[in-house]
Amino acid sequence: MQFDYIIIGAGSAGNVLATRLTEDPNTTVLLLEAGGPDYRFDFRTQMPAALAFPLQGKRYNWAYETEPEPFMNNRRMECGRGKGLGGSSLINGMCYIRGNALDLDNWAQEPSLENWSYLDCLPYYRKAETRDVGENDYHGGDGPVSVTTSKPGVNPLFEAMIEAGMQAGYPRTDDLNGYQQEGFGPMDRTVTPHGRRASTARGYLDQAKSRPNLTIRTHAMTDHIIFDGKRAVGVEWLEGDSTIPTRAAANKEVLLCAGAIASPQILQRSGVGNAELLAEFDIPLVHELPGVGENLQDHLEMYLQYECKEPVSLYPALQWWNQPRIGAEWLFGGTGVGASNHFEAGGFIRSREEFAWPNIQYHFLPVAINYNGSNAVKEHGFQCHVGSMRSPSRGHVRIKSRDPHQHPGILFNYMSHEQDWQEFRDAIRITREIMHQPALDQYRGREISPGVECQTDEQLDEFVRNHAETAFHPCGTCKMGYDEMAVVDGEGRVHGLEGLRVVDASIMPQIITGNLNATTIMIGEKIADMIRGKEALPRSTAGYFVANGMPVRAKK
């Protein structure tokens, strides 16, 4: 089998590349996905409110686990990643958050990454998006990904939480992806107008999968990339339960889009990475790149949970006797409780003036429950998800075997810097202040977690060690740049090799201020044009907010 391009991983970026490259009918593409199809009849992935279900099994989730995290009481922590057409866009929380403009401007400060500035990237965010309330300078109107904005009157807790943030002195913003990210406001979501999850399989592959020049193979576990000298010339994979490898040749390029955990793992198995690590497993060295698998970053978050005095939370939706009605309303009408992920309000703030742009993110949820659906509080409640955005802590991904079915060693080194602890203490104390504003007096009952007795630095730190969780945003393990630890250049091409690119969240040099899916899609769109030799979309002229030393909040 021969193709022009072989794409490894049908996730948020891989599906973008498969769709854009096959717009040219003379270009042939093979798309390999280790998981299965995105079954449209499976409510677990298609119903927005069911977002916790895919994380509870292994059909759609790689269900990775970290090594014992040394600063988190040696907990082995969850590291869920999507498996199946859509990748992590098939199982994520559907929050459409692009990050802060200054995140990308910060990337562009690196030599030869100048064209990754916010205004250079904004046209590609817009290209990917169809926003339900229409396009403007910041949002697209005819892209593959459906984005739904929160509408007034969904739940009184959303508006009360935004109002409480304003009463605490923080700004309101009507668009967290628009002119000003900083502040509290409604959150955009990747949900279709018919109340279905808008994964990249739905948005991109649905329009491309019938093209004769696109071949999609599911249940295809990539073993390694095949090299001829320093040039990638093909891929070898295992189909289903077979132990007999299948091969295909790439006439032009191999495009690795397997995500921040699997992309470095595949490179290492293919002979690209740290020479000492590869020698441990007798893997012939193709090219030494010490940065492969290093620079691992993530967002850590915790929940502050409160009793709700008014019966307006989603607690009734957790009762089994209400779920058939909710399911029917969603299935036949695309409406109701099932049609939302219920992360419809949130915000970004600076916890201290030393931060030039927001370093703390909030998601508000009108029910008290863990992200993966466990430990639901058995009463009306609500919670704030809060966490820091740009931790200085760095971890790694390293193979533990040549066997493609064996998970790699993953260590995030969460909370390994003093800055981490200061930010989380600040986050808890600021959140409590917001929760005690008059806007929430009508609804706020007792603090369920961490509980009012948890006050001192030592008590707060212990709460974080025991209860903070991943926000499922790993990135950075094949970072873009030109220093000695960089893996790819500004076009995703792997340093020192030919015919091989990495295109996914692993190439982010530094984690962004917000959820990763929207920016991963943007990366796919931008590099697709580079691969095709197309001129970049014209740079945007839209304005954007920069604090420039403004106080973090208004004085009361």
UniProtKB/Swiss-Prot annotation:
It is found in: Cell membrane. Pathway: Amine and polyamine biosynthesis; betaine biosynthesis via choline pathway; betaine aldehyde from choline (cytochrome c reductase route): step 1/1. Pfam families: GMC_oxred_C, GMC_oxred_N. One of its GO terms (cellular component) is plasma membrane. Its cofactor is FAD. Its EC number is 1.1.99.1, 1.2.1.8. PROSITE patterns: GMC_OXRED_1 (PS00623), GMC_OXRED_2 (PS00624). GO terms for molecular function: betaine-aldehyde dehydrogenase (NAD+) activity; choline dehydrogenase activity; flavin adenine dinucleotide binding. PANTHER family: CHOLINE DEHYDROGENASE, MITOCHONDRIAL, GLUCOSE-METHANOL-CHOLINE GMC OXIDOREDUCTASE. This is Oxygen-dependent choline dehydrogenase. It comes from Escherichia coli O6:H1 (strain CFT073 / ATCC 700928 / UPEC).
